[in-house]
Amino acid sequence: MPIQVLPPQLANQIAAGEVVERPASVVKELVENSLDAGATRIDIDIERGGAKLIRIRDNGCGIKKDELALALARHATSKIASLDDLEAIISLGFRGEALASISSVSRLTLTSRTAEQQEAWQAYAEGRDMDVTVKPAAHPVGTTLEVLDLFYNTPARRKFLRTEKTEFSHIDEIIRRIALARFDVTINLSHNGKIVRQYRAVPEGGQKERRLGAICGTAFLEQALAIEWQHGDLTLRGWVADPNHTTPALAEIQYCYVNGRMMRDRLINHAIRQACEDKLGADQQPAFVLYLEIDPHQVDVNVHPAKHEVRFHQSRLVHDFIYQGVLSVLQQQLETPLPLDDEPQPAPRAIPENRVAAGRNHFAEPAAREPVAPRYSPAPASGSRPAAPWPNAQPGYQKQQGEVYRQLLQTPAPMQKPKAPEPQEPALAANSQSFGRVLTIVHSDCALLERDGNISLLSLPVAERWLRQAQLTPGEAPVCAQPLLIPLRLKVSGEEKSALEKAQSALAELGIDFQSDAQHVTIRAVPLPLRQQNLQILIPELIGYLAKQSVFEPGNIAQWIARNLMSEHAQWIARNLMSEHAQWSMAQAITLLADVERLCPQLVKTPPGGLLQSVDLHPAIKALKDE
C-alpha cells in the first residue's frame, strides 16, 4: 500500500481515540471550553449516560459567525498563537483538537452568538471531508453544543461503553471536580430529563465551604483543615481532612488542581501522603481538596493526551513545598505540648584538637541529594508580598517567606583569612580512645561491646544524644548555619519574642538564624544536624524552653536540644515519621561509635551514667564449671 494522506474524517477519528475515551471525556472537553469562554452558568443535559445526547449550554462570550467553521477544524484554537503561549498556558484548552475529534465520532451541532451579533448561527460537519455547514438559528448570547449518538460510526468503540449508570457516574465525577475548581460558576446537571446536581455560584468572599460540603459531604467538611501556604510564586490553598479521623469513604476524596486544572499527579499525591503518613495506617489514604498555583512557565501541561498530568520544572521544590504546607496544618492539631526537661546534666566540652585529629565527621553530613549551602552572614530580609485572601483560612497558616530564602541564597559568603597550618596532633592510641568492637545488637538499641576481654553494653540512643550535643556545641568558630529551603514561620507571644531576642546571639553561635516581627518569628537557617529533624515540633518546644530561662548559654541550649531530640516523643516521631533507627543495625552502631570516639573522647575515659554498663560473665562461667 503506498504512502498517502489520510482523509480528514479518518484522521480525526484516530485523534479521537486519545481525546474521546468515553462520554465523560466529551463533557470534560466541552465544559472546559465554556469556562475558557468566561461562562458564569453552564447547563448540562445527558441522556442514556451520554451515549444518546450530551448538550452543554453556557452564557460565555460566544463564537463569531466567521469562526464557526474554524472551530470544527483540527488545530484551530483561540487559546494560543505562538510557542511562547504554549510554554505559559493559562487556559484549560489549547490544542484545538476536541471539537474536530468529537464531531468525527458523533453528530455534533454547534450553535453560538456573540454580544455584537443580532442573530445566532449554527454549524455542523458531515461527510467524508467533514465539510461544515452554517445556517441561522435562534439562541441567546453564549454557546450550545449538542453531541448526538456518540460513536455511531465506530461500532468497535461503542461496544466498549459500560452501562448507562456507570457512564453517568463518570460524568457526575467530572462535574464534581469542575465544580470544585470554579466556585464562581453555576453548574446544573440533568440526566434523562431529571435534575441531578445543582451547584450554585459562590459570590466573591462568600462561604466556599457550602459548595465543598455539597460535593464532598458533611463528614469531610467536619474534619477539613484549611490551608493557606505561600513561598515565592508557589501558593497552596484548600482543605485536608484530619488524618486521625479518616475513613474509607473520606479517602475517596482526593482532588488536586494546578492553576485551576484538575490533576492526578503522583508527585503531589506522594507529598501529601508523606506529610500524613505518621497518622495514617498502611491501608489508609489521605482526603484532601487542594489548589496549587504556580508560575505557568514552571509547569508543562502538554504531556498527557487528556491533560490529566503535568510536569514541574522544579519538581523537588514543589514536592517539599506541598509537604511542608500540609505538615504545618497537621501540626496545629498537636494539643498537648511536651513537658520541658530542665534537669541539669553536665555537658561534654568540645575539644578543638580532637576535632582536627578526627577529620571529616560523616555522621553530620547531609544526604547526598541535598547540596551543602555555603556559610553566610545573616542579613535582614525584605518583606514578601501578601497572599490572596482565602475564606476561613487561619492566619497562622500564611507563609510569605519566599523573599527571605532568595536573599539568603544571594548573600555572598564572607571572605576568610587563610589560616596558618596547625601542628598535627599525634595519632590516638588504638585502645585508649575506643569503646571496643561491636559484637552484636541487643534489644534493638543496645550494642554489645568487647574490649580487652571485657564485655559491656552501650546504649545507642544515649550515645547519639551525646554526639548530637557535641555537633551542636560551638568550638572556636560558630556552628555553620544551613538556610532552609522554605523558612519556618511561627506565631509567638510577647514573652517568647522577648526571650528569643535575648537568646539571639547564643542561637547564632549554634547556627540558628531567625527574624522576628510583631507577632511572628521566621526561622531562616538551622545547623546541619537539625536539617533532617521535624522543625515544626522542635522549634516551638525550643521557644518554650527559652521563655523559661534567664541565662542563655550556647552549651546549655545545645544540651537541651540534644536531650529533646532523643526524648520519648522525638523517638516516636523518628519511628513513625522518618523511620529512623527503629531497629539499629551493626553498620549504624559502628558508624555512631566511631564518631563519638572522635568528637567526644572524654566519654571513653569517663562514661557518664546511662551510656555504658559492664557485663559480669564470671557468675555464668562459674555456673558452667559447677555443672
From Swiss-Prot:
The record's InterPro entries line, in alphabetical order, gives: DNA_mismatch_repair_CS (IPR014762), DNA_mismatch_repair_MutL (IPR020667), DNA_mismatch_S5_2-like (IPR013507), HATPase_C_sf (IPR036890), MutL/Mlh/PMS (IPR002099), MutL/Mlh/Pms-like (IPR038973), MutL_C (IPR014790), MutL_C_dimsub (IPR042120)
GN (gene name): mutL
Looking at the record's lineage, which domain of life comes first? Bacteria
Q: What's the source species for this entry?
A: Shigella flexneri serotype 5b (strain 8401)
**What does the similarity note say?**
Belongs to the DNA mismatch repair MutL/HexB family.
**DNA repair as UniProt keyword:** yes
Q: Does the keyword Iron-sulfur apply?
A: no
The name under which this protein is listed is: DNA mismatch repair protein MutL
Report the function annotation for this chain. Answer: This protein is involved in the repair of mismatches in DNA. It is required for dam-dependent methyl-directed DNA mismatch repair. May act as a 'molecular matchmaker', a protein that promotes the formation of a stable complex between two or more DNA-binding proteins in an ATP-dependent manner without itself being part of a final effector complex.
Which Gene3D superfamilies is this protein grouped with?
3.30.230.10, Histidine kinase-like ATPase, C-terminal domain, MutL, C-terminal domain, dimerisation subdomain, MutL, C-terminal domain, regulatory subdomain
